[in-house]
Regions:
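Structural motif
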Residues: 83-86, 152
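Alpha/beta catalytic cores of group-transfer enzymes, especially the acyltransferase/condensing modules
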Residues: 9-11, 38, 97-171
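Residues that mark the start of a beta-strand
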Residues: 1-2, 126
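Helix-rich "cap/lid" substructures immediately adjacent to catalytic or cofactor-binding pockets
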Residues: 2-84, 162
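Alpha-helical scaffold segments in soluble metabolic enzymes
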Residues: 15, 19, 33, 70, ...
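Glycine-rich nucleophile elbow surrounding the catalytic serine of serine-hydrolase chemistry
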Residues: 86-95, 99-100
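A broad detector of short, well-ordered amphipathic alpha-helices
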Residues: 25, 32-33, 66, 70, ...
Length: 171
């Protein structure tokens, strides 16, 4: 069985799919369309920006979405039997499956990212992946810390994401 599984936020890195942009007419057209839709040159940040610029939610989410969707569109001969996505990757899966257009998917992801960015500016917070500990241990540690910190995403056994106030998460 062939499948695409698309990642969520956190999979970004500077320079991702730059080679595809430079060598694929379809990829370049889609990236340029994305620059227009977003109202800024996300390609400049994706290909040449700093890790800090790329880490901003309002940039990260559209960048990861574009990486996933454009890669899938350039591999259309692959024809997966199923698609799935983790968190943000669910939007990429919807576009890859034809349930959403590229344009609508990008607009939704951009609005989602802006809303999340705004929420972070109103109430500064953060997330951190905790690897190699049992869920109940992480939950107990979170409960013992002053401030707000909770187990937020149970990714898989041994990988849990915590979120909350910056000072509490950093403890």
């Amino acid at each position: 069985m062939k499948a695409y599984v698309f990642p969520g936020q956190g999979a970004q890195f500077t320079g991702m799919v730059k080679d595809l942009y430079e060598n694929s007419k379809l990829a370049k057209e889609l990236f340029e369309k994305a620059n227009e839709i977003l109202g800024f040159r996300i390609t400049d940040i994706m290909f040449e920006g700093t890790a800090e610029e790329l880490k901003e939610t309002k940039v990260t989410q559209p960048a990861v979405f574009l990486h996933s969707v454009i890669l899938a569109k350039t591999l259309e001969d692959f024809k997966p039997e199923m698609v799935a996505g983790h968190s943000l990757g669910e939007f990429s899966a919807l576009v890859a499956n034809g349930a959403l257009s590229f344009e609508d998917g990008l607009k939704l992801v951009s609005q989602r990212a802006l809303a999340m960015q705004k929420a972070c500016e109103i109430k500064p917070s953060t997330m951190a992946a905790v690897l190699g500990l049992a869920d109940n241990i992480v939950e107990e540690v979170c409960a013992s810390i002053d401030g707000v910190v909770v187990a937020a995403n149970y990714n898989c056994p041994g990988q849990l994401v915590i979120s909350g106030e910056i000072s509490a998460v950093e403890r």
